[in-house]
Amino acid sequence: MASYEIVKGDLFTAQTSLAHCVSQDLRMGKGIATEFVKRWGRPKELYDQRYERLAVLKRQNEQGEWRYLYYMITKEKAWHKPSLKDFMKSLVHVLKHMIKNDVKHLSVPKLGAGLDGLSWDLIERALKKQFVEKHGINVTVYVL
């Protein structure tokens, strides 16, 4: 049975697939996105995918196992605020990619609830219902 848990700690200690929100311009100059840039840079393969709702990198974790890094494209420019509708469209793309690639665990910050200002309650409900309950995907939310 899949699980949903909230953990106090550093998202980047997770060895699972990770997701975070970005703008289509891929500026990634604030918030948790800056840490993604420090760790994985801005490879060309991200820019090649930026006109979709989702950009994905496949990278090895510290144990040498493959995992996905999901860059959820929720808005056009870094200074814009996403709508809940656009956020949810991107989240569905993450879910579809995970199902297609048999990914069973996703670790995230409080997606969309930080700088983007979306309702965490609505996002949390979607994660629990669609990922955990409906598709058996484990979700771990990291908070500081």
Regions found by a protein language model. Give the residues of each.
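Macrodomain-like recognition of ADP-ribose-binding/processing modules
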Residues: 1-144
